């Protein structure tokens, strides 16, 4: 009985996550459109965004109580964001489009993702990940940025504000970081 209850809770949580992602994507679309209007009539080639679906292949990331793998959630969200951006005539480069690991080791995998980002010089690079907590009451999306990047901090603020408009109960703040992960 406990197992069935946990399974149902897991399914409800996943349904909520998917619905939340849909709402977030709609709000992000509006926010991004407003931001892009301030950039002006830039050529499509100047409007490149790199989307990185974290983990992949044998690296599943976190695994939920219902067996859902972070790598799969990341790829689903990233594909949804890609569709929204492409509707706005923004060229999207994906670090991965399938369930694949980009290199043999985690370090090499991360380096390859960074290489993709550096080669295309995007206006924005976003890596999608999920966090897990032992406490059930901890929730909400949080945006991290590289601590010495003022542009990254500004972009993180715009994205975090859009996320909080969708879910006002999300009290998370943007967070600077200097570690090497995407």
Segments and roles (model prediction):
Residues 1-182:
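Catalytic-site microenvironment of enzymes
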